[in-house]
Amino acid sequence: MSKHHMEKLTCPSCHHDGDFEVWDSINTVLDPEMKEKVLNQSIFLYTCPNCGENFRLNYPILYHQMEDLVMIYLVPESEVEKTYEIFFEKNALADFHTEKYLNRIVTSANQLVEKIQIFDAGKDDRMLELVKLLATDSILKNDPDIEFDELRFAVDDDGTNILVIINKGEITGAVDIDNMYEFASSHCDDFKDLRDDEDIVINLSLIHISEPTRRRGISCAVFC
């Protein structure tokens, strides 16, 4: 079930107190309308009732897309290891193990949204982290002077899978990745089935590229 509670907040602009609804967990079967509020990140937005200023808040949340057996935990960076250990404690969340849930831990609202979009598109997030490496290499070869902070998965209006190029919080371009995804998939046949893999923290920092793979020009990476 979805859980939420109210918290008192003081506006940092006008110092007026107001109420903010904090969602501890969201179940998209029981509350289907909440999925869009997660995707547009409005559940993290507080509007001061006095001055009208908007403020973005970050707080932990468990996102449960029960119809697809997907659970994504948004926690602070400092809580990742603890959350991982709790999840794999003996008998902890046993039903979710037996049902082959797809579980992930993320540390930002943007990562949460990206994971939802990846799984809704039927993609493997492990493979997409490899695609980001390929895309980064391609972008820099075409424009060595380009500056960007992040590549983030999205689905274009016409259904094309893309990586948006983000620099200083602004989208500055996009890359069509369907061919790169197919290429990476064809060269990486040693991954476990997505729902059999016990790794639940998947990002670029967890990828090690093996030397034989480097020589082939594609990363069949080891996630650890």
Predicted regions mapped to residue ranges:
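Short, surface-exposed beta-strand/loop "edge" segments at domain boundaries and coil↔beta transitions
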Residues: 80-84, 169-176
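Single conserved hydrophobic/aromatic residue that forms the stacking wall/gate
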Residues: 207-224
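N-terminal cysteine/histidine-rich coordination modules
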Residues: 1-76
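Domain-exit/linker segments immediately C-terminal to small folded modules
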Residues: 47-135
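Electrostatic, structured charged patches in enzyme active sites and in nucleic-acid/phosphate-binding
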Residues: 181-195
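Conserved phosphate-interacting/catalytic interface
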Residues: 194-206
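Long, low-hydrophobicity ectodomains and other hydrophilic envelope-associated domains
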Residues: 137-140, 145-147
